[in-house]
From Swiss-Prot:
Matches recorded under Pfam families: Bac_DNA_binding
Species in which this protein is naturally found: Dichelobacter nodosus (strain VCS1703A)
Keywords associated with the record: DNA recombination, DNA-binding, Transcription, Transcription regulation, Translation regulation
Function, as annotated: This protein is one of the two subunits of integration host factor, a specific DNA-binding protein that functions in genetic recombination as well as in transcriptional and translational control.
Entry-linked InterPro entries: Hist_DNA-bd, Histone-like_DNA-bd_CS, IHF-like_DNA-bd_dom_sf, IHF_alpha
Protein name: Integration host factor subunit alpha
Gene Ontology MF terms in the entry: DNA binding; structural constituent of chromatin
């Protein structure tokens, strides 16, 4: 199952009992705050969950898979996520679906 923003909104409605528009606004504001912080280069640290941070990747050689031609992959900035200890422990103790 994939967790979506709509699922998070529904969980907030079920647990807190606030109106849907208010729950949607809370979720949208949370994600916008994360985006804004990352856009300005600030790391986002969510206690008990993990950290989002920016990493700079250097230019490197790559290949066009169709032609085999060597092409440069440009330097870029990417978002990385590192899971916190509590999240890692929770995942480790869960049973695989199958």
């Amino acid at each position: 199952m994939t967790l979506t923003k709509a699922d998070i909104v529904e969980a907030i409605i079920a647990q807190i009992g606030i109106p849907r528009p208010e729950a949607r606004e809370i979720v949208d504001d949370l994600f916008e705050e994360i985006r804004s912080c990352l856009a300005t280069g600030e790391p986002v640290k969510l206690s008990g969950f993990g950290n989002f941070e920016l990493r700079d990747k250097n230019q490197r050689p790559g290949r066009n898979p169709k032609t085999g031609e060597e092409i440069p992959i440009t330097a870029r900035r990417v978002v990385s996520f590192k899971a916190g200890q509590k999240l890692k422990a929770r995942v480790a103790e869960s049973k695989p679906r199958g």
